[in-house]
Amino acid sequence: MDSNTTSSFQVDCFLWHVRKRFADQEMGDAPFLDRIRRDQKSLKGRSITLGIDIEAATRAGKLIIERILDEESDEALKMNIASVPASRYVTDMTPEEMSRDWFMLVPKQKFAGPLCIRMDQAILDKNIILKANFSVAFDRLETLILLRAFTSEGATVGEISQLPSLPGHTSEDVKNAIGILIGGLEWNDNTVRVSETLQRFAWGSSNENGRPPFAPKQERKMAGTVESEV
């Protein structure tokens, strides 16, 4: 096994341990806690693949980090921090909108990579807006925390969330999932808009009609796959 692969796993295990200790003191925000959950799944999978015990790897990772910190000057640390863009958390939804319970009369569930799409196909002829809470880096969507679809009356009728068993996703995964959700809701003659904030950070632009600039391939997929499965 490549020594770099082993040492990388050891360092990741120790850094996860530090972040978990921080979170246990109730000081982590939503994106921070979400990354801990996703990374835990990833580390367990890597442990099985590499055949390395996580506890032993964590101890070895601690020694590696301690050695690096002993050699690190304050000036080098400042330069490294300055060169890394900080993620920020963007909220379309209120805490109440994000946490409220909702149910589906005619449930429909689909998957787009590591994302789960749920929608109520009993909803007809409604004006619907998609809102999301997510983290941003380099002015682009980095990690989707939760996306929900709301009618103009405020009812929750759809959702996109991460699958705990498949941690990690890309902005393309998010855009594909949004396309599937829009296609499913529009099949029942609903009018769907995407919030300007989500458009701006996921697609880099926003349209007044609330329709993101989907690629032709995505448009065909939205129209075709949903029709055949509903």
UniProtKB/Swiss-Prot annotation:
The keyword Ubl conjugation belongs to this UniProt entry's keyword annotation: yes
Principal location listed in the UniProt entry: host cell
Ubl conjugation keyword on record: yes
Region annotated RNA-binding and homodimerization, chain positions: 1-73
Location of the protein in the cell: Host nucleus; Host cytoplasm
Domain of life: Viruses
Motif Nuclear export signal positions after renumbering to this chain: 137-146
Annotated disulfide bonds: none
Residue ranges, annotated region (Disordered): 204-230
Post-translational modification: Upon interferon induction, ISGylated via host HERC5; this results in the impairment of NS1 interaction with RNA targets due to its inability to form homodimers and to interact with host EIF2AK2/PKR.
A biological process term (GO) from this entry: symbiont-mediated suppression of host mRNA processing
UniProt short sequence motif Nuclear localization signal, positions renumbered to this chain: 34-38
GO CC list: host cell cytoplasm; host cell nucleus
Region (CPSF4-binding): 180-215
One of the record's GO molecular function terms: RNA binding
Keyword entries, A-Z: Eukaryotic host gene expression shutoff by virus, Host cytoplasm, Host gene expression shutoff by virus, Host mRNA suppression by virus, Host nucleus, Host-virus interaction, Inhibition of host innate immune response by virus, Inhibition of host interferon signaling pathway by virus, Inhibition of host PKR by virus, Inhibition of host pre-mRNA processing by virus, Inhibition of host RIG-I by virus, Inhibition of host RLR pathway by virus, Interferon antiviral system evasion, RNA-binding, Ubl conjugation, Viral immunoevasion
Entry remark concerning the domains of this protein: The dsRNA-binding region is required for suppression of RNA silencing.
UniProt family annotation: Belongs to the influenza A viruses NS1 family.
HAMAP family: INFV_NS1
Record's subunit section: Homodimer. Interacts with host TRIM25 (via coiled coil); this interaction specifically inhibits TRIM25 multimerization and TRIM25-mediated RIGI CARD ubiquitination. Interacts with human EIF2AK2/PKR, CPSF4, IVNS1ABP and PABPN1.
Function: Inhibits post-transcriptional processing of cellular pre-mRNA, by binding and inhibiting two cellular proteins that are required for the 3'-end processing of cellular pre-mRNAs: the 30 kDa cleavage and polyadenylation specificity factor/CPSF4 and the poly(A)-binding protein 2/PABPN1. In turn, unprocessed 3' end pre-mRNAs accumulate in the host nucleus and are no longer exported to the cytoplasm. Cellular protein synthesis is thereby shut off very early after virus infection.
Name of the protein described by the UniProt record: Non-structural protein 1
